[in-house]
Amino acid sequence: MKSLQKGFTLIELMIVVAIIGILAAFAIPAYNDYIARTQVSEGVSLADGLKIRIADNLQDGDCVTKGDSSTGEVGNEDKGKYALATILGTPAQNLSELKAEDPNGCQVKIEYGKGTSGGSVSALINNTELVLAQLANGSYKKESSTVKDKFLPKALKENK
């Protein structure tokens, strides 16, 4: 009488493990890139939040204000989980004469790895920075970056 096979053979299990290993070899780097892109996007979102502060500062004639946190006055930086965004620059002369796509002289410097979480920043972007120049229409243009282009949002890649 023949006995019925119950379970899997060692070869079948080894094949399954090999297939999982091959899939993981492709999936893990792609996942790490995804994490880095997400964290870079957080920094760009912080810069978007600083647009209103820059506009307020420009009303006073400068890109940077002398904020005082003890009095509740808003400062020139915004800290997220993975990045720190800081307002820099000197306003261009004759702001009212600038075209919409001309830089207004104000910049936002985004430093990755200086956020509130410290060590949980992706190693692919840790200790890198992205400097965005604000245009007269309020949008941003990439001015300089040590962040690899593949991690930048599409709008910044197209707007070099």
Curated annotation (Swiss-Prot):
Its main location: other. The chain crosses the membrane at residues 8-28. PROSITE patterns: PROKAR_NTER_METHYL. Belongs to the N-Me-Phe pilin family. GO terms for cellular component: membrane; pilus. Disulfide bonds join 63-106. The pili are polar flexible filaments of about 5.4 nanometers diameter and 2.5 micrometers average length; they consist of only a single polypeptide chain arranged in a helical configuration of five subunits per turn in the assembled pilus. This is Type IV major fimbrial protein FimA. It is found in: Fimbrium; Membrane. The gene is fimA. The keyword Calcium does not apply. Residues 1-7 form a propeptide. PANTHER family: GENERAL SECRETION PATHWAY PROTEIN G, PREPILIN PEPTIDASE-DEPENDENT PROTEIN D. Major component of the type IV fimbriae that plays an essential role in twitching motility, natural transformation, and protease secretion. It comes from the Bacteria. Pfam families: N_methyl, Pilin.
